[in-house]
From Swiss-Prot:
NADP(+) binds at R46. Its cofactor is FMNH2. CDD domains: Chorismate_synthase (cd07304). Homotetramer. This is Chorismate synthase. Its EC number is 4.2.3.5. The gene is aroC.
Amino acid sequence: MNTFGTRLKFTSFGESHGVAVGCIIDGMPAGVKFDEEFLQNELDKRKGGSKFATPRKESDKAQVLSGVFEGYTTGHPIAIVVFNENAHSKDYDNLKDLFRPAHADFTYFYKYGIRDHRGGGRSSARESVARVAGGAVAAMLLREFDICVQSGVFGVGTFVSNLKEEEFDFEFAKKSEIFCLDPKLESDFKNEILNARNSKDSVGAAVFTKVSGMLVGLGEVLYDKLDSKLAHALMGINAVKAVEIGEGINASKMRGSCHNDALKDGKFLSNHSGGILGGISNGENLILKTYFKPTPSIFAKQESIDKFGNNLEFELKGRHDPCVGVRGSVVASAMVRLVLADCLLLNASANLNNLKNAYGLK
């Protein structure tokens, strides 16, 4: 599906080499201050053009078509479009019938019977422009509640930071070309990416997301737990293969006496749960880790088949990220923001008191 969310519905549209990509955000309350500069800054963070990302250079200028009047949201659908200006579709002519390894070519073709071979169409990371735009709008609502979502890279290839989560440097990451959270490892991360690129290869990455200012009570029980919603959102990002919340996999190696977050004087003494208990936020920071596979588009010679079943060797052309996880950190923040904004709106009717408060009743 192309639509995400329950109360705050986000729909993306467009293809990598189509006319444009964009989104529609429906359900945003009226009266939220719309920060167009922030929206553009988020899109600029996601842009390629550096030696650590795709050479494809797009202006990615957002055009807000509806849902905003005199600087505030109107309560009606917000439509945002970003026109594609630098697509090189001819680079993909040799892939019309070919299935690229680790791409969605094979599965899209056999599911739909048709696929857009130009840059992958809807399966391209270009679609994440829409996600970042939608996430920026969601962040404008979260600001009203002082909820802050931050992401950065803590691992590239075999280089992984051993800093404690509270030691990750988000201020440094804001200035880093690769959103690196560990200043001591930035050069290693960069070299790993460049070495992969120079050898016609790619490399994976690990992204850390922290949400501060969390409220108690976001999320639902059982099938709409906050952690399941977050995992769903993050796993839907291109190239993501795993998500951890709190201690994540490490929790399976721990004793309950160590993993349990004790309370004293009304406060949690630790946060092994990552800010979620029983599928509902407990007010502590949300702690998330998202793991990206190596970009499947590599320039080394590869083997595959075409749609007729013929065995082929081929070499890709085009412009591709040597490490998709770097820009993926911006997308991770966007998806988390969309989930939290949706949960905030859902929580407004979670119990009778909340509902009465919405109408000024006691």
